[in-house]
């Protein structure tokens, strides 16, 4: 079957920064260019900074949160999330139009496996309206302005908040 490219669908030049080969391969399949990065979260953010002007859209995948969840290593998973939190000011300094933080699935350390639990989504743009969420977690996201959305709705929302849609809705 023909697989459409992100450029054809959304008109964006897209880059991927990912340690895990499967994500790089899938990204290539949909027309994204792989940006070389080292193995650490800091390395991935450095690669993002260095290549920021070359792309309209980035997918940055942090694998260790998933790996630690599968191992049942709550502390390890927590430390990786804290590492991402420490690196976020570097992303904010680049002044992107939209930032999305989410996961491709839940991997609770207590389950030691991928699970059926909903995945929290944080979407930020200067066009976002304030909501009642006070943090970013599975529980706190129920107070967020996005509500419960399907994954297929995320890219059009991102494009809308980046002011890159010709029209939203019917």
Locate predicted features.
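Feature captures the catalytic ectodomains and active-site-proximal regions of enzymes
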Residues: 1-170
């Amino acid at each position: 079957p023909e697989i459409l490219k992100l450029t054809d669908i959304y008109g964006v030049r897209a880059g991927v920064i990912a340690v895990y080969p499967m994500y790089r391969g899938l990204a290539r399949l949909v027309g994204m260019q792989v940006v070389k990065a080292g193995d650490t979260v800091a390395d991935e953010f450095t690669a993002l900074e260095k290549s920021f002007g070359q792309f309209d859209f980035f997918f940055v995948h942090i694998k260790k949160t998933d790996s630690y969840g599968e191992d049942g290593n709550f502390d390890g998973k927590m430390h990786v999330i804290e590492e991402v939190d420490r690196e976020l000011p570097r992303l904010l300094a680049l002044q992107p139009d939209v930032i999305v933080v989410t996961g491709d699935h839940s991997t609770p350390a207590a389950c030691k496996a991928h699970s059926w639990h909903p995945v929290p989504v944080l979407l930020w743009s200067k066009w976002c309206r304030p909501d009642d969420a006070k943090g970013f977690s599975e529980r706190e996201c129920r107070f967020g302005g996005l509500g419960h959305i399907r994954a297929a709705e995320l890219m059009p929302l991102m494009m809308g908040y980046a002011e890159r849609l010709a029209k939203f809705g019917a």
